[in-house]
Amino acid sequence: LIPSQFLGFSWYNQADLGAQLKYDFDWWGKQRATLEAALDQAHAAEAQRSAAALALQYAVADTYFGWQADQARLQLADQALATQQQFSRIADLRVKQGVDLPDEAQKARAQLAAVQEMRVALEGSAKIRRVSLASLLGVAPEQLPELQPRPLPRVDEGIPANAALDLISRRPDIAASRWQVEAALRQTDAARAEFFPDFSISAMAGLSSIDLGKLFTAGSRTFALTPALHLPIFNGGALKANYGVSKAQLDAAIAQYDSTVLGAAREVATQALGAQQIAARRVVQRTRVDAQRQLLANAQARAAQGVRDARESLVAKAQWLQQRDAAVQLQAQAVATDLALVKALGGGYRDASAADRNADATSSVTAGARP
């Protein structure tokens, strides 16, 4: 409505439509090293998640089988309690009849109280393990399904012949440390490449017009090709500092990897030695259980024949139950040690990223070897 000469300025509309492409020749491998470092970091994070999952699985299994061991010992404690109650009743009767001194009845009551105390402790341990199991599973104790007592699993007495480096190398924490070293190596390569010239080229093509109606005409076409050369001349100090940091991070990653491997080897050796010791103790304990079972059978036979009273067979039964309880404890230790050994060996973890990389390398070699 008002002419532009009276306003002191003018305006116009401009329409632009285009695309831009930039290509870095990456002669020194900086971009490739940066990409590989990021991928290695992602693989390390995945391995760390697997390590956390393995730790959780081990805690759940160890707590569950600990609860089963408490249940097995509670069953033996019930039998021991019934045996000791029967023995205490006989002792009280003999004191009333004047056959024994009151001290014998007091001894029987003390032994009965010891069995009752052990049973209360086992009940408390089972309840604590159940609460711990619910916490590990992320549910409230009342939401945990009802657990049923089951026999403890059989544990093979021995360890795999290849329980050394072959299986240790599968541990997720070692895999994570290895990927961290790989990432640090790639970051060091990228920092080294910063010292060399960087050549890139940019291309732009599109349409530009101050008249929207003429945007798609031939006269509105634009094109530009711009080469660029970066010479790291004036920032040598910063590049040296960055390279020094990368080298320090690489040294730290290597030290962490060495520490992880040594710790894993020590853990496996400790658990394997513990498994061997428990296996030897279980052999001795089975002999003691069998011997005590034979003593119980002999005492029961004498009681049936009237040669001895029932107290001898009750004492023999109490001792037999004690030996069985010790055997259950050793079996529980064997299960716990076996679980710890499985965890120390990586729990069957396989580094899929490393396997894929090895498969790709094998395929490349095979393809290159074909005529």
Language-model segments: which ranges?
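Sec/SRP-type N-terminal targeting helices
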Residues: 25-53, 79, 103, 107, ...
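Small/polar, glycine/serine/threonine/aspartate-rich low-complexity segments that form flexible
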Residues: 1-20, 143-160, 189, 202-242, ...
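Periplasmic alpha-helical coiled-coil/stalk elements that build and connect Gram-negative outer-membrane
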Residues: 31, 40, 47-163, 274, ...
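Extracytoplasmic
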Residues: 14-16, 128, 162, 196
